[in-house]
Regions:
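Short, charged beta-turn/beta-strand-edge "cap" motif at the junction between a beta-strand
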Residues: 15-19
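Compact nucleic-acid interaction/catalytic patches
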Residues: 20-24, 29-62
Length: 117
């Protein structure tokens, strides 16, 4: 089993929100490396090239990845589209998000789950 790392952008068969179908999509691995090494699962959030403004999202560009990869288009990380997936479902890594961009994503997740006042 390949161990994927936090900040990896990987391809997976990702379900539509109504669970009616799935499509191979890029996702960002959120779970930390220790969790990923010891678990059969990873925690991810979805990416899209639909850049329409939306709460709980962060825009990333092709220059926001550390490794030359196949992130071909500016994308929106959907911090409100979270899933736990078996690592066996992951098809391949295509890029790795820079730490400063990952911090923007985790800030949006924090905004999503923080207590409303």
């Amino acid at each position: 089993m390949s161990t994927y790392k936090q900040r990896d952008i990987v391809l997976v068969p990702f379900p539509f929100s109504d669970l009616s179908q799935q499509k191979v999509r890029p996702v960002l691995i959120l779970s930390n490396d220790d969790y990923n090494r010891h678990s059969a699962d990873v925690v991810v959030c979805g990416l899209t090239t639909n850049l329409a403004p939306a709460p709980y999202s962060a825009i990333i560009d092709v220059t926001d990845v550390e490794q030359a990869g196949t992130l071909r288009h500016k994308s929106k990380v959907k911090a409100d589209t979270l899933a736990t997936l078996e690592q066996a479902l992951l098809i391949k890594q295509v890029a790795r998000l820079k730490p400063e961009c990952f911090n923007l994503v985790t800030a949006e997740i924090h905004n999503l789950i923080r207590e409303s006042r």
